[in-house]
């Protein structure tokens, strides 16, 4: 991890955290882990980005949506595309709308990361085998060291979750515990954030 990590909270939105949605599953432990990370990033005034999958028209990611028809519910005014309220997203924390798995693909995330001076990434969220994995791989391909706290990401299938973390740790990122990451973050020694 560098001196100024950025946190990318991938798709921790109602559609993925609420089992009433076809895309969702109950994952309170993942939400809680993300809240702990957000608290520390906010305390140190480090950069935070949220992402959400949103489709504005039928042409966007049409092949992806044919492969996974449940994505059709992710429309701009839908409850399902809103960040889980337990994370208490602030207006100052950018929300990146995306249409594909990677948070980098066809978005301005790379420009925003460069603009804020981030030198490494902490990638969390849902789902481990999909958008978290794609974002972590693309983060590396943008030449950022990537850390993934295992408790802060999740998947509908535990075996797929574990296999994805194993593969990511082998090739693309450092998968570590939430507690270890929080210790590393505390050691950076940035001051308290201002109230936003």
Language model regions located:
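Active-site acidic carboxylates
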Residues: 1-90, 94, 185-196
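Glycine-centered short loops/turns at secondary-structure junctions
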Residues: 45-46, 117, 143
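Internal catalytic-core helix/loop-beta-alpha segment
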Residues: 78-80, 84-126
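Short acidic-hydrophobic, aromatic-tinged amphipathic segments that line or gate anion-handling sites
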Residues: 96, 174-181
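A short glycine-rich beta-strand->turn/loop micro-motif centered on a GG-aromatic cluster
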Residues: 122-125, 145-158
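Short Gly/Thr/Asp-enriched flexible loops that form oxyanion-binding sites at enzyme active sites
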Residues: 132-142
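Active-site-proximal loop->helix
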Residues: 155-169
């Amino acid at each position: 991890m560098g001196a100024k990590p950025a946190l990318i909270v991938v798709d921790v939105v109602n559609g993925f955290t609420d089992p009433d949605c076809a895309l969702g599953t109950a994952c309170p432990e993942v939400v809680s882990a993300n809240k702990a990370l957000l608290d520390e990033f906010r305390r140190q005034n480090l950069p935070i980005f949220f992402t959400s999958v949103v489709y504005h028209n039928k042409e966007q990611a049409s092949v992806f949506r044919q492969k996974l028809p449940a994505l059709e519910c992710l429309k701009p005014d839908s409850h399902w595309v809103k960040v889980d309220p337990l994370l208490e997203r602030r207006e100052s924390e950018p929300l990146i709308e995306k249409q594909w798995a990677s948070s980098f693909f066809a978005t301005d995330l790379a420009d925003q990361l460069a603009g804020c001076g981030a030198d490494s990434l902490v990638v969390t969220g849902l789902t481990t085998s999909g958008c978290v994995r794609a974002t972590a791989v693309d983060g590396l391909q943008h030449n950022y060291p990537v850390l993934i706290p295992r408790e802060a990401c999740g998947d509908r299938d535990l075996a797929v979750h574990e296999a994805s973390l194993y593969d990511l740790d082998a090739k693309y990122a450092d998968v570590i515990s939430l507690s270890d990451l929080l210790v590393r973050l505390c050691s950076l020694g940035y001051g308290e954030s201002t109230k936003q």
